[in-house]
C-alpha cells in the first residue's frame, strides 16, 4: 500500500496483480471528497471504475495512432518536464518527445522505465491510461500521480457548473 498526494488530501492506493504481471488492479480510497479519488468515490456511491489502463509496446507509436484518430491527451504542466529533466537528465530527443506528447515518465533504481499517457476525463470522472514498461520496472508511476491529478483538476469544469 502506498500514499498518493493530492492537493485535497491523501489517497491510499493498494495494487493487486497476478504472478505474471499481466493483470493489475489498483484500488484507491480517500478520507474526504476533496481529493479527486474521494470525489469520484462519493459520486459513484463507493463502487465504480475510475480508469482503465492499456499496455503498449511503444507508447510513442500508440500516441501517434491515437492522435490520427482525434485523441487529445491530458495536458501536463510544463513544470513537470522541468522537474523531470532535473531528476533524470534525459537526452534532448527523449525529453522533447515526452513533453510534446504529454507523456509522464519514471525510472527505477535498476534502470527500468515507465511511460504514462492519459486521456482527459470523460463524463463523471472516467479516464483512460496507456502505459509502457521497459526493463523490469514493477511500479505504477506513483511519483507522477500528483502531476496527473493536478492536470485533471485543471481540466475539470469549475465547481458548481452543470455537468451536462
How should each PLM-predicted stretch be described?
Residues 7-164:
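Glyoxalase I/VOC metalloenzyme domain signal
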Residues 2-5:
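Short, solvent-exposed loop/turn elements at beta->coil junctions and helix N-caps
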Amino acid at each position: 500500500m502506498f500514499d498518493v498526494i493530492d492537493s485535497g488530501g491523501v489517497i491510499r492506493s493498494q495494487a493487486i496483480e497476478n504472478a505474471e504481471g499481466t493483470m493489475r488492479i489498483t484500488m484507491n480510497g480517500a478520507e474526504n471528497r476533496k481529493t479527486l479519488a474521494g470525489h469520484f468515490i462519493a459520486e459513484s456511491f463507493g463502487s465504480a471504475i475510475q480508469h482503465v489502463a492499456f499496455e503498449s509496446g511503444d507508447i510513442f507509436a500508440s500516441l501517434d495512432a491515437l492522435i490520427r484518430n482525434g485523441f487529445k491527451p491530458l495536458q501536463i504542466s510544463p513544470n513537470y518536464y522541468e522537474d523531470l529533466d532535473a531528476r533524470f537528465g534525459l537526452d534532448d530527443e527523449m525529453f522533447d518527445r515526452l513533453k510534446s506528447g504529454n507523456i509522464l515518465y519514471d525510472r527505477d533504481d535498476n534502470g527500468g522505465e515507465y511511460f504514462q499517457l492519459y486521456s482527459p476525463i470523460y463524463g463523471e470522472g472516467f479516464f483512460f491510461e496507456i502505459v509502457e514498461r521497459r526493463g523490469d520496472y514493477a511500479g505504477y508511476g506513483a511519483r507522477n500521480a500528483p502531476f496527473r491529478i493536478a492536470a485533471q483538476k485543471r481540466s475539470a469544469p469549475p465547481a458548481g457548473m452543470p455537468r451536462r
